[in-house]
A protein has these predicted regions:
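Glycoside hydrolase catalytic-domain context in secreted enzymes
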Residues: 1-318
Length: 318
């Protein structure tokens, strides 16, 4: 069934799925949104039952406004108070971070919201993180596994996350978004992840979209560069491969083109994972998309989020 569906998509449609990872509601300080406690405050409760309920509340609100994915939670480690996004991450303790992250993801995804947990992994500073080539992070394998990867592993194994957001830093000298070992060997083959991935927002020139696609990072979440690569400049030629069609990519100097079957395969594989993540979310509502979900919600500073959108909320389906 999936083969038949993917065969029906044009090259342009496959490219759009890869390059169209941005959009939707935005930001922790968005006007008109719901204000929640900061993530370290949540971790300070040590209350996984409470965090699971909060995840369900996130999911309920997403259902009401028509969202099927959440670019979160952020689960990097508080390596330093000067991290830059410490307010967005749970703790300096990997066990506490992993425990909180797994249950809030599990709660949110119980409502059909795909959680693109971020930023996998070792994203420990913001300065030089993206604009100047990606900071190089070095550690032993034990340190990476026990501290910086644990929350992401637990969100896959116990939170059953349907998404993952990668980071712009480098592991050693290799850009995380372009790292085959991170995406295919660790995330999918070892941890058993079956969802889709997205890179961090606004990729710079050092993030090769071509290598990103081939490494198994499925979606580009916006870019303010030309990202000159086969992804956007490759052209479909229906006459190739005995009439089955294939992609013509430009040579390095741009004066000629060559046939690249491997590039088509990588693009198709990522596009299929993106589509599978969508149909496993609430976007299609089990293909009963002609109904409308509404609820009576009170607004105002005095209104508690638990009252507004707790599990006891009465939803009206029309």
């Amino acid at each position: 069934l999936w083969d038949s569906y993917m065969n029906s998509l044009t090259w342009e449609e496959l490219v759009k799925l890869f390059t169209d990872g941005d959009g939707g509601k935005d930001g922790p300080v968005q006007f008109g949104g719901t204000c929640w406690q900061s993530t370290p405050i949540a971790a300070a409760t040590w209350n996984i039952e409470l965090l699971e309920e909060q995840g369900k509340m996130y999911g309920n609100q997403a259902l009401l406004v028509g969202l099927f994915s959440w670019r979160g939670p952020g689960t990097n480690i508080h390596r330093s108070p000067f991290n830059g996004r410490t307010f967005e991450y749970y703790s300096e303790d990997p066990f506490l971070t992993a425990s909180m992250a797994a249950v809030i993801v599990d709660g949110c995804q119980s409502k059909g919201v795909s959680c693109f947990a971020k930023h996998m992994f070792a994203n420990v500073q913001e300065y030089n993180r993206a604009d100047y080539g990606g900071v190089c992070t070095f550690a032993t394998e034990q340190v990476f596994r026990e501290i910086y990867q644990r929350s992401f592993e637990w969100m896959v194994k116990y939170g059953h996350t349907n998404g993952m957001m990668t980071s712009f830093n480098r592991v050693g000298y290799v850009v995380n978004s372009n790292n085959w070992a991170v995406h295919e060997e660790l995330l999918r083959n070892e941890w058993g992840f079956t969802g889709a991935t997205v890179d961090d927002a606004w990729a710079k020139d050092f993030v090769s979209c071509d290598l990103m696609l081939r490494a198994g990072d499925d979606t580009l979440m916006g870019s303010d560069t030309a990202h000159k690569c086969y992804v956007t400049v490759g052209q479909w030629d229906a006459s190739l491969r005995d009439g089955k069609g294939d992609v013509l990519c430009p040579t390095e100097d741009g004066d000629d083109t060559f046939e690249s079957t491997t590039h088509y395969y990588a693009m198709r594989k990522s596009a299929q994972r993106i589509q599978q993540a969508k149909v496993n979310s609430n976007q299609y509502k089990n293909f009963a998309s002609d109904f409308e979900l509404t609820a009576t919600v009170s607004y105002g500073l005095a209104n508690a989020a638990q009252i507004a959108c707790a599990e006891t909320t009465d939803f009206n389906v029309t």
